[in-house]
């Protein structure tokens, strides 16, 4: 009897030991699971915190004006029938046509000009630039020593000159000489893009809005005044007796826009037909300020014209007009006010 009880006791103890061991294993598994979850949570929290701090530290572009040079360039520039890739913002330009020097001065980019034409307008500050000749007679050695990013011209260079510059790694951009107000504006847009890349679009629009306002102020009062009065007959005389602005020229078109009857419309390409000389009876003569007015007064063609008899000979700075820039508008304002002073309160 006693032996049987002992065996039972031993069996019971073995079962209890197994039960306790199994319960401890379960508790350990639960603790491991809890620790694993806690570790995953901490890892996720640290990762998200680092990402947030990194985003806070990264600079952000707020608007278009904050674009870097890399972001504003490269751009493709279409000039005439040619396309140019402007890889980065130009640091240096050589400009061999006076009208392009004026245009860059107008848009505030004259500081980029490291080489300028010999006939550059004195009104544009070029203190840091070297004289490099002209488009038709360039100083190639000087150009190569200046090392511009681009050479700009408004008349075609000789192919031999272009090839020598290309061998030195310098490209030439040939602009069309503008023959209308629209083409003047388009050239300004192109120059803004060349100098400022994508930012140039906004800069160009702001500039051209001011340009148009300035032009309207110069000539609109005269054009409105002639609606209630008769037009004056006028010519824009480059050389006596028949070299004058004809109908297809910009100067001829501007005479019309200012409310004048341009007698030069009978001619073409700055040449008036001599056989029509009897029709040359202008009320006002705008002439190149480099001319001696006595040449006009003594001319058999104009000596008895209303313009000479009433002393309506108005000098005009033709060089400023040919620059096709802001100085041209100043000359137009003087012409319009001379012809129709009443329209301007005179």
Where are these regions (language model features)?
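Bacterial N-terminal signal peptides
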Residues: 38-47
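A short, structured surface patch at a secondary-structure boundary
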Residues: 91-146, 150-155, 263
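Short secondary-structure boundary segments
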Residues: 97, 155, 177, 238-240, ...
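Alpha-helical, coiled-coil/dimerization segments enriched in small aliphatic residues
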Residues: 119-122, 242-271
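Structured C-terminal subdomain patch of bacterial secreted/periplasmic proteins
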Residues: 182-196, 220-223, 286-346
